[in-house]
């Protein structure tokens, strides 16, 4: 597996589920370890194997740095 991560940003109006799903798809397609982005004050690092539901749950619990 690659040790590279790519930082991205999403446009206004994108839901967290959409952002996490697209980040996971891009990480898999590009063969990178993580796609990184911020969403409403929380940092996300999303791997190709990311559990989207876990990411949403951790965000709803108030976590500020979420690696999935």
Model-derived features with residue positions:
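Short intrinsically disordered terminal tails
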Residues: 1-3, 61-68
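N-terminal acidic leader/helix
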Residues: 2-30
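Intrinsically disordered, low-complexity serine/threonine-rich segments
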Residues: 5, 12, 40-42, 50, ...
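N-terminal non-cleavable signal-anchor helices
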Residues: 9, 47, 67-68
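Short, intrinsically disordered terminal segments enriched in charged and Pro/Gly residues
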Residues: 52-64
């Amino acid at each position: 597996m690659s040790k590279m991560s790519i930082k991205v940003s999403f446009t206004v109006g994108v839901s967290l589920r959409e952002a996490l799903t697209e980040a996971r798809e891009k990480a898999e397609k590009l063969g990178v370890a993580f796609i990184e982005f911020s969403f409403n004050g929380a940092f996300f690092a999303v791997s190709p194997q990311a559990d989207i539901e876990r990411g949403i749950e951790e965000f709803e619990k108030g976590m500020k740095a979420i690696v999935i």
